[in-house]
A protein has these predicted regions:
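ATP-dependent NMP and nucleoside kinases share a basic, alpha-helical "lid"
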Residues: 150-227
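Hydrophobic positions on the alpha1 helix immediately C-terminal to the Walker A/P-loop
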Residues: 83
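N-terminal phosphate/diphosphate-binding loop that engages ATP/GTP or pyrophosphate donors
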Residues: 90-154
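Conserved lysine of the Walker
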Residues: 80
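Small-molecule kinase domains that catalyze NTP-dependent phosphoryl transfer to phosphate-bearing small molecules
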Residues: 134-136, 179-185, 196-198, 202, ...
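Short, positively charged and aromatic/hydrophobic N-terminal segments
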Residues: 40, 48, 52-55, 61
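Hydrophobic anchor at the beta1->P-loop junction of P-loop NTPases
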Residues: 72
Length: 290
């Protein structure tokens, strides 16, 4: 399995034009490469004859022959995104950060001034949203109605906005097919809150990644400092505990460990050790499935 993935140009490879998956108001499945030209047909498939384009088609054909999907769930600040992104790059898989998608909807609700806890109000703005997820130079970026909001959705206040809107069945239904389509067409590492329990219940490997609230708050503080954002530690810890409570107790798709998920607790280990552990678990399962 490993040999095959190394010989395929991943969909997010820097040598490829950005892959995009739009949802919402526009039905046009199109992506824009660095030259500004559209290279995606109405089914969302990349077309063309360059080496990179042939690589993308090969990746799709490989997906049809052998499916391998990794579902990673866990609480806020557990390191899901950073670890999953690095593991995906190491193993030649497509990384999908579903939390970024919900953050984008949360940002839209905040900008429009709607009551984020009112499902009817939030559902009313969904048809107006066109959300695109693009891979540019190996990084996932989020676009809201054509605007790059990748940085804005990482602001601390957007975390609770995402938690609020993700509690609504209308929002989860709105985004569910997009997530499943990505997994159908690619070998993915997808992280979120309900990937192994709802989105990809048949995933080849499920992992529940967690750490203590205090450890997660420490890590979040370092991220914020690196971004030049000032926020008291006590406030960061309170937000994490509040987010946990809300995510675990919502009626729709609550955060929980799937029965067949591998539990990985990173409280006492650093990022590099966590990466080696997680990557080892995934590689072992990939080889077993080959």
């Amino acid at each position: 399995m490993k040999r095959k993935t190394e010989n395929v140009v991943p969909p997010y490879s820097p040598m490829c034009a950005p892959w995009t998956s739009p949802i919402g108001g526009s039905k046009e499945r199109a992506g824009i490469d660095r030259s500004g030209k559209s290279h995606y047909n109405t089914e969302g498939y990349f077309v063309g004859n360059s080496a990179a384009e042939r690589g993308l088609r090969s990746a799709r054909e490989e997906k049809k022959m052998k499916s391998f999907d990794v579902a990673i769930d866990g609480p806020s600040g557990a390191g899901k995104s950073s670890l999953a992104r690095r593991c995906a790059a190491e193993l030649g898989l497509l990384y999908v950060d579903t939390g970024a998608i919900y953050r984008t909807v949360g940002l839209a609700a905040l900008r429009r001034g709607v009551d984020r806890k009112d499902e009817t109000a939030v559902a009313a703005i969904l048809p107006e949203l066109e959300i695109q997820m693009a891979y540019e130079d190996g990084e996932q970026r989020m676009y809201l109605n054509g605007e790059d909001v990748s940085r804005e959705i990482r602001m601390p206040e957007i975390s609770m906005c995402a938690s609020d809107v993700s509690a609504h069945a209308a929002v989860r239904s709105f985004l569910l097919e997009m997530q499943r389509k990505l997994a159908r067409e690619n070998c993915v590492i997808m992280d979120g809150r309900d990937i192994g329990t709802v989105v990809l219940p048949e995933a080849k490997l499920k992992i529940y990644l967690t750490a203590s609230p205090e450890a997660r708050a420490d890590r979040r503080m370092k991220e914020l400092v690196a971004k030049g954002v000032e926020q008291p530690y006590e406030e960061v810890l309170r937000d994490i505990i509040q987010r946990d409570e809300q995510d675990m107790n919502r009626e729709v798709a609550p955060l929980r460990q799937a029965e067949d998920a591998v539990l990985v607790d990173t409280t006492e280990i650093d990022f590099d050790e966590s990466f080696r552990l997680l990557c080892g678990i995934i590689r072992e399962r990939m080889e077993a499935e080959a």
